[in-house]
């Protein structure tokens, strides 16, 4: 019942008063986020990988402030169609009960066919580069990566298993053992794949003292290069 109420609430027309309030809240939240190093480095990382590609586009306080209520409502009516909805249900339900629940969950959504999503182009090859951004934070936030695989790639599970050894396995990963345990450069270091409709990023991330950022970066690259050359044991 809570889920049904939530969908029905989302389907209601948005008043101008509510739109203006939520727009102002979103602009303020983004302005605050843009002061934080983790937000800055993440946005810079995606822009460096994808440039003018749709994956590289970033919202700004100005772009959010320019959005009109009618534009938001039209987008919702076009793309949030019941015919395009996917409903996942887990529990002790018969098929007929699940179908009835799915019908209740989607009946408040627009009934139009919906506009097909545009084809996202493949990103252009990315050049190797290093960007440094001055910030008064006590720690340096480091990200390393590049576009790699898209959804449905046959190598996803081999890469997932391999990355568990490299940096996705927490305290048993090579990056954690070298960067944290052996050298003490960071409390945590991670790596993961993010497949998208087009090649999404492989990313390594960590935070460290500014004074040792160069050493931490060099060690992280060394571990990555060794893993690529030799693979897991």
Language model regions located:
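Single conserved hydrophobic/aromatic residue that forms the stacking wall/gate
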Residues: 1-10
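A common structural junction motif
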Residues: 9-14, 105-113, 222-232
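Non-catalytic beta-strand/loop surface segments
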Residues: 20, 29-83, 108-153, 167-214
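Helix N-cap motif at beta-to-alpha junctions
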Residues: 91-96, 209-213
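Hydrophobic side chains in well-ordered alpha-helices
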Residues: 98-101, 175, 216
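Extended amphipathic alpha-helical segments enriched in small hydrophobics
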Residues: 201-202, 206-233
């Amino acid at each position: 019942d809570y889920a049904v109420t939530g969908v029905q609430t989302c389907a209601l027309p948005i008043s101008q008063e509510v739109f203006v309030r939520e727009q102002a809240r979103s602009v303020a939240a983004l302005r605050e986020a843009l002061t934080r190093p983790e937000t800055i480095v993440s946005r810079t990382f995606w822009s460096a990988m994808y440039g003018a590609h749709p994956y590289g586009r970033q919202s700004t306080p100005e772009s959010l402030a320019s959005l009109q209520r009618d534009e938001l409502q039209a987008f919702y009516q076009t793309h949030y169609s019941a015919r395009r909805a996917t409903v996942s249900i887990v529990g002790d339900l018969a098929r007929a009960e699940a179908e009835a629940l799915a019908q209740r969950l989607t009946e408040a959504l627009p009934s139009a066919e919906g506009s097909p999503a545009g084809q996202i182009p493949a990103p252009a090859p990315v050049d190797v580069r290093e960007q440094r951004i001055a910030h008064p934070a006590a720690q340096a936030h480091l990200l390393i990566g590049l576009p790699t695989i898209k959804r449905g790639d046959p190598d996803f599970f081999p890469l997932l298993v391999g990355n568990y050894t490299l940096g996705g396995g927490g305290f048993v990963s090579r990056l954690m053992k070298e960067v944290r345990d052996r050298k003490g450069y960071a409390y945590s270091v991670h790596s993961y794949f993010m497949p998208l409709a087009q090649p999404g990023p492989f990313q390594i991330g960590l935070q460290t003292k500014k004074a040792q950022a160069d050493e931490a970066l060099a060690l992280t690259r060394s571990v990555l290069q060794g893993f690529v050359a030799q693979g897991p044991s």
